[in-house]
């Protein structure tokens, strides 16, 4: 690898501001704000709006809209019953 062109990779704490969920991971992102982790070391803190702890897809609170097809909409519009067995 070429020296001097790659960003510094280090451990940071990602903090979900919605749920206050924290996890430690490696990143090239840095911050002037620091926090003490469970191992007693201080790491930079990166604040997140959404993480796997608060995103509806990962929490199971996601709502799926019923996507009716064109035939179903036509049958519904004219009060016809579908031929599904």
Curated annotation (Swiss-Prot):
A GO CC annotation given for this chain: ribonucleoprotein complex
Listed HAMAP family: Ribosomal_bL31_2
Gene Ontology biological process: translation
PROSITE patterns referenced in this protein's UniProt entry, alphabetically: RIBOSOMAL_L31
Gene field: rpmE2
GO molecular function: structural constituent of ribosome
Matching InterPro entries: Ribosomal_bL28/bL31-like_sf, Ribosomal_bL31, Ribosomal_bL31_B, Ribosomal_bL31_sf
Source species, domain of life: Bacteria
UniProt keyword Nuclease present: no
This protein's UniProt keywords: Ribonucleoprotein, Ribosomal protein
Protein's name according to its UniProt entry: Large ribosomal subunit protein bL31B
Family named by the database record: Belongs to the bacterial ribosomal protein bL31 family. Type B subfamily.
Subunit text: Part of the 50S ribosomal subunit.
């Amino acid at each position: 690898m070429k020296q001097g062109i790659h960003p510094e990779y280090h451990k940071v704490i990602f903090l979900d501001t919605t749920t206050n969920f924290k996890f430690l991971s490696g990143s090239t992102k840095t911050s002037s704000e620091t926090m003490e982790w469970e191992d007693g070391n201080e790491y930079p803190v990166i604040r997140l709006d959404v993480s796997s702890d608060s995103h509806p897809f990962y929490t199971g609170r996601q709502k799926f809209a019923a996507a009716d097809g064109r035939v179903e909409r036509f049958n519904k519009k004219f009060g016809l019953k579908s031929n599904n067995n």
